[in-house]
Amino acid sequence: GLCLVTGEVGPIENIHPSIKNVAGAQSSGAALVSFNAPAFCSYGKEQNLNAPTGKFAAFAYTTALNHLLSDRDHVFRIGDATVVCWARNAKPAYAALFGGAAFGAAVPSYTENDLRGMVKSLCSGQPVTYEADKLDPGMDFYVLGLSPNAARLSVRFFLHNTFGGFLRNIQAHYDRLEIVRPAYDKFETLPLWKLLSETVNQNSRDKSPAPDLAGEVLRAVLMNTRYPATLLNGVTLRIRAEREITRGRAAVLKAYYRKLQETIKRENPDIPEEVLQVSLNPNTNNIPYT
Protein backbone atom coordinates (compact mmCIF):
# COMPACT_ATOMS: atom_id res chain seq x y z
CA GLY A 1 0.00 0.00 0.00
CA LEU A 2 0.90 3.69 -0.23
CA CYS A 3 2.27 5.15 3.02
CA LEU A 4 0.63 8.47 3.91
CA VAL A 5 3.80 9.60 5.72
CA THR A 6 6.58 8.81 3.26
CA GLY A 7 4.56 8.58 0.04
CA GLU A 8 6.29 5.30 -0.75
CA VAL A 9 4.70 1.98 -1.67
CA GLY A 10 5.40 -0.86 0.75
CA PRO A 11 3.97 -3.02 3.53
CA ILE A 12 1.44 -1.23 5.77
CA GLU A 13 1.48 -1.52 9.57
CA ASN A 14 -1.86 -2.91 10.76
CA ILE A 15 -1.43 -2.04 14.48
CA HIS A 16 0.93 0.73 15.56
CA PRO A 17 3.08 0.31 18.68
CA SER A 18 1.80 2.04 21.83
CA ILE A 19 3.04 5.39 23.12
CA LYS A 20 4.01 5.36 26.80
CA ASN A 21 4.78 7.89 29.55
CA VAL A 22 1.92 10.27 28.75
CA ALA A 23 0.36 11.55 31.98
CA GLY A 24 -3.17 10.24 32.52
CA ALA A 25 -2.95 7.58 29.80
CA GLN A 26 -2.88 3.84 30.42
CA SER A 27 0.37 2.64 31.97
CA SER A 28 0.66 0.00 29.25
CA GLY A 29 0.60 2.72 26.62
CA ALA A 30 -1.93 4.38 24.34
CA ALA A 31 -2.33 4.58 20.59
CA LEU A 32 -1.87 7.71 18.54
CA VAL A 33 -3.51 6.02 15.55
CA SER A 34 -6.14 3.31 16.06
CA PHE A 35 -9.44 2.07 14.62
CA ASN A 36 -11.11 -0.41 16.97
CA ALA A 37 -14.78 -0.27 15.94
CA PRO A 38 -16.56 -0.85 12.61
CA ALA A 39 -18.10 2.64 12.79
CA PHE A 40 -14.63 4.15 12.33
CA CYS A 41 -13.73 2.08 9.28
CA SER A 42 -14.36 2.75 5.59
CA TYR A 43 -14.30 0.86 2.29
CA GLY A 44 -14.07 -2.52 4.03
CA LYS A 45 -10.65 -1.79 5.53
CA GLU A 46 -9.81 -2.92 9.05
CA GLN A 47 -7.87 -1.30 11.89
CA ASN A 48 -5.03 1.03 10.83
CA LEU A 49 -5.38 0.15 7.17
CA ASN A 50 -7.88 3.03 7.24
CA ALA A 51 -4.93 5.38 7.74
CA PRO A 52 -2.19 3.49 5.87
CA THR A 53 1.23 4.01 7.40
CA GLY A 54 4.24 2.03 6.26
CA LYS A 55 5.88 -0.36 8.73
CA PHE A 56 9.07 1.69 8.77
CA ALA A 57 7.27 5.00 9.35
CA ALA A 58 5.12 3.51 12.14
CA PHE A 59 8.20 2.05 13.83
CA ALA A 60 10.16 5.28 13.40
CA TYR A 61 7.63 7.73 14.85
CA THR A 62 6.65 5.53 17.81
CA THR A 63 10.27 4.71 18.68
CA ALA A 64 11.37 8.34 18.49
CA LEU A 65 8.38 9.59 20.49
CA ASN A 66 8.76 6.92 23.18
CA HIS A 67 12.45 7.80 23.49
CA LEU A 68 11.67 11.50 23.95
CA LEU A 69 8.87 10.81 26.44
CA SER A 70 11.15 8.60 28.52
CA ASP A 71 13.65 11.46 28.92
CA ARG A 72 12.43 13.84 31.63
CA ASP A 73 14.61 16.63 30.24
CA HIS A 74 12.40 16.78 27.14
CA VAL A 75 9.01 16.43 28.87
CA PHE A 76 6.89 18.94 30.78
CA ARG A 77 3.43 18.68 32.30
CA ILE A 78 0.99 21.55 32.20
CA GLY A 79 -2.65 20.94 33.14
CA ASP A 80 -3.85 17.77 31.43
CA ALA A 81 -1.28 18.09 28.64
CA THR A 82 2.06 16.34 28.37
CA VAL A 83 4.43 18.56 26.39
CA VAL A 84 7.51 17.15 24.67
CA CYS A 85 10.00 19.34 22.83
CA TRP A 86 13.19 18.84 20.86
CA ALA A 87 15.65 20.59 18.56
CA ARG A 88 16.50 19.37 15.07
CA ASN A 89 20.12 18.69 16.08
CA ALA A 90 18.88 16.60 19.06
CA LYS A 91 20.94 18.49 21.66
CA PRO A 92 19.10 18.34 25.02
CA ALA A 93 20.38 21.79 26.05
CA TYR A 94 17.73 23.42 23.83
CA ALA A 95 14.89 21.61 25.61
CA ALA A 96 16.36 22.39 29.04
CA LEU A 97 16.60 26.12 28.37
CA PHE A 98 13.16 26.13 26.76
CA GLY A 99 11.71 24.47 29.86
CA GLY A 100 13.20 27.14 32.08
CA ALA A 101 11.88 29.95 29.89
CA ALA A 102 8.41 28.58 29.14
CA PHE A 103 7.52 26.60 32.27
CA GLY A 104 9.76 28.01 34.98
CA ALA A 105 11.52 24.66 35.27
CA ALA A 106 14.70 24.56 37.34
CA VAL A 107 17.85 25.08 35.28
CA PRO A 108 20.84 23.54 37.10
CA SER A 109 23.99 25.63 37.54
CA TYR A 110 22.29 28.83 36.37
CA THR A 111 20.55 31.60 38.28
CA GLU A 112 17.34 33.25 37.15
CA ASN A 113 19.35 36.30 36.07
CA ASP A 114 21.65 34.06 34.00
CA LEU A 115 18.61 32.52 32.33
CA ARG A 116 17.08 35.90 31.53
CA GLY A 117 20.37 37.08 30.05
CA MET A 118 20.64 34.04 27.78
CA VAL A 119 17.02 34.37 26.66
CA LYS A 120 17.56 38.07 25.91
CA SER A 121 20.62 37.27 23.77
CA LEU A 122 18.82 34.50 21.88
CA CYS A 123 15.81 36.75 21.29
CA SER A 124 18.11 39.31 19.68
CA GLY A 125 19.61 36.66 17.40
CA GLN A 126 22.87 36.09 19.27
CA PRO A 127 24.01 32.51 20.04
CA VAL A 128 24.80 31.62 23.66
CA THR A 129 26.75 28.85 25.37
CA TYR A 130 24.71 26.64 27.69
CA GLU A 131 26.27 23.64 29.45
CA ALA A 132 29.16 23.58 26.94
CA ASP A 133 26.71 23.60 24.00
CA LYS A 134 26.44 26.56 21.68
CA LEU A 135 22.75 27.32 21.19
CA ASP A 136 21.77 28.74 17.81
CA PRO A 137 18.64 30.95 17.81
CA GLY A 138 17.97 29.87 14.22
CA MET A 139 17.81 26.16 15.11
CA ASP A 140 14.53 24.45 14.17
CA PHE A 141 12.60 23.61 17.33
CA TYR A 142 9.45 21.52 17.79
CA VAL A 143 6.83 21.40 20.56
CA LEU A 144 4.24 18.61 20.74
CA GLY A 145 1.32 18.57 23.18
CA LEU A 146 -0.43 15.27 23.94
CA SER A 147 -3.51 14.55 26.06
CA PRO A 148 -4.97 11.17 27.09
CA ASN A 149 -8.32 10.07 25.73
CA ALA A 150 -9.16 6.60 27.08
CA ALA A 151 -6.92 4.14 25.19
CA ARG A 152 -5.94 6.78 22.65
CA LEU A 153 -3.89 9.95 22.59
CA SER A 154 -5.03 13.31 21.27
CA VAL A 155 -2.60 15.73 19.67
CA ARG A 156 -3.39 19.07 21.28
CA PHE A 157 -0.86 20.96 19.19
CA PHE A 158 2.28 20.41 17.15
CA LEU A 159 4.26 23.62 16.72
CA HIS A 160 7.38 24.40 14.71
CA ASN A 161 9.47 27.55 14.83
CA THR A 162 13.07 28.57 15.28
CA PHE A 163 14.36 28.35 18.83
CA GLY A 164 14.78 32.12 18.95
CA GLY A 165 11.29 32.61 17.52
CA PHE A 166 9.69 30.63 20.34
CA LEU A 167 11.72 32.51 22.94
CA ARG A 168 10.70 35.88 21.47
CA ASN A 169 7.05 34.89 21.73
CA ILE A 170 7.54 33.76 25.33
CA GLN A 171 9.31 37.01 26.19
CA ALA A 172 6.49 39.03 24.62
CA HIS A 173 4.07 37.09 26.84
CA TYR A 174 6.07 37.97 29.96
CA ASP A 175 6.21 41.61 28.90
CA ARG A 176 2.42 41.70 28.67
CA LEU A 177 2.17 40.16 32.15
CA GLU A 178 4.51 42.70 33.73
CA ILE A 179 2.83 44.39 36.66
CA VAL A 180 3.83 45.84 40.04
CA ARG A 181 4.11 43.03 42.56
CA PRO A 182 3.86 43.10 46.37
CA ALA A 183 7.06 42.84 48.42
CA TYR A 184 6.23 39.33 49.65
CA ASP A 185 5.82 37.97 46.10
CA LYS A 186 9.05 36.16 45.22
CA PHE A 187 8.15 35.41 41.59
CA GLU A 188 10.11 37.65 39.23
CA THR A 189 7.94 36.37 36.38
CA LEU A 190 4.68 34.45 36.56
CA PRO A 191 5.06 30.87 35.26
CA LEU A 192 2.24 29.34 33.28
CA TRP A 193 1.11 26.98 36.05
CA LYS A 194 0.62 29.94 38.40
CA LEU A 195 -1.51 31.78 35.86
CA LEU A 196 -3.71 28.72 35.43
CA SER A 197 -4.05 28.37 39.20
CA GLU A 198 -5.68 31.82 39.26
CA THR A 199 -8.70 30.31 37.50
CA VAL A 200 -9.20 27.61 40.15
CA ASN A 201 -10.94 27.69 43.53
CA GLN A 202 -8.06 26.96 45.90
CA ASN A 203 -10.50 25.61 48.51
CA SER A 204 -11.84 22.92 46.20
CA ARG A 205 -10.65 19.34 46.31
CA ASP A 206 -9.74 19.33 42.62
CA LYS A 207 -7.40 22.21 41.87
CA SER A 208 -6.92 21.33 38.21
CA PRO A 209 -7.69 24.03 35.63
CA ALA A 210 -10.52 23.53 33.17
CA PRO A 211 -9.92 20.83 30.55
CA ASP A 212 -8.14 22.11 27.44
CA LEU A 213 -7.34 25.47 29.07
CA ALA A 214 -3.65 24.73 29.69
CA GLY A 215 -3.05 23.61 26.12
CA GLU A 216 -4.91 26.57 24.64
CA VAL A 217 -3.00 29.09 26.76
CA LEU A 218 0.37 27.48 26.02
CA ARG A 219 -0.36 27.46 22.30
CA ALA A 220 -1.34 31.15 22.44
CA VAL A 221 1.92 31.98 24.24
CA LEU A 222 4.15 30.02 21.88
CA MET A 223 2.39 31.23 18.71
CA ASN A 224 1.99 34.81 19.98
CA THR A 225 -1.75 34.77 19.30
CA ARG A 226 -4.73 35.94 21.37
CA TYR A 227 -5.27 34.25 24.70
CA PRO A 228 -8.38 32.05 24.92
CA ALA A 229 -11.48 33.76 26.30
CA THR A 230 -11.80 30.89 28.79
CA LEU A 231 -8.69 32.22 30.59
CA LEU A 232 -10.30 35.65 31.03
CA ASN A 233 -13.62 34.10 32.04
CA GLY A 234 -11.95 31.84 34.61
CA VAL A 235 -10.10 34.73 36.24
CA THR A 236 -13.10 37.09 36.33
CA LEU A 237 -15.22 34.30 37.83
CA ARG A 238 -12.74 33.86 40.69
CA ILE A 239 -12.58 37.63 41.26
CA ARG A 240 -16.37 37.83 41.55
CA ALA A 241 -16.56 34.78 43.81
CA GLU A 242 -13.67 35.66 46.13
CA ARG A 243 -13.71 39.48 45.91
CA GLU A 244 -9.94 39.45 45.67
CA ILE A 245 -7.64 40.61 42.89
CA THR A 246 -4.24 38.96 43.19
CA ARG A 247 -1.14 39.91 41.25
CA GLY A 248 -1.69 36.94 38.95
CA ARG A 249 -5.30 37.82 38.20
CA ALA A 250 -4.46 41.45 37.51
CA ALA A 251 -1.62 40.33 35.25
CA VAL A 252 -3.94 38.02 33.29
CA LEU A 253 -6.44 40.85 32.76
CA LYS A 254 -3.68 43.18 31.58
CA ALA A 255 -2.09 40.60 29.27
CA TYR A 256 -5.42 39.52 27.77
CA TYR A 257 -6.55 43.04 26.89
CA ARG A 258 -3.11 44.19 25.75
CA LYS A 259 -2.90 41.26 23.33
CA LEU A 260 -6.45 41.99 22.20
CA GLN A 261 -5.46 45.58 21.51
CA GLU A 262 -2.38 44.43 19.57
CA THR A 263 -4.50 42.06 17.51
CA ILE A 264 -7.30 44.40 16.47
CA LYS A 265 -4.76 47.17 15.70
CA ARG A 266 -7.16 49.96 16.62
CA GLU A 267 -8.50 51.64 19.70
CA ASN A 268 -11.19 49.56 21.38
CA PRO A 269 -13.56 51.44 23.70
CA ASP A 270 -14.22 48.18 25.58
CA ILE A 271 -10.59 48.11 26.82
CA PRO A 272 -10.02 50.59 29.67
CA GLU A 273 -6.66 52.31 29.31
CA GLU A 274 -5.97 51.73 33.00
CA VAL A 275 -6.03 47.94 32.56
CA LEU A 276 -3.05 48.14 30.21
CA GLN A 277 -0.80 49.91 32.73
CA VAL A 278 1.92 48.27 34.83
CA SER A 279 0.75 49.88 38.09
CA LEU A 280 -2.54 50.94 39.68
CA ASN A 281 -3.98 54.31 38.63
CA PRO A 282 -5.76 55.77 41.70
CA ASN A 283 -6.75 58.96 39.86
CA THR A 284 -8.93 57.38 37.19
CA ASN A 285 -12.63 58.17 36.85
CA ASN A 286 -13.39 54.74 35.39
CA ILE A 287 -15.92 53.35 37.89
CA PRO A 288 -15.63 49.62 36.98
CA TYR A 289 -11.84 49.89 37.26
CA THR A 290 -11.88 51.58 40.67
Predicted ranges, named:
Residues 2:
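The −1 position to Zn-ligating cysteines in a subset of zinc-ribbon hairpins
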Residues 6:
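Short Cys/His-rich metal-coordination motifs, predominantly Zn2+-binding knuckles/fingers
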Residues 10-290:
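Extended alpha-helical scaffolding segments
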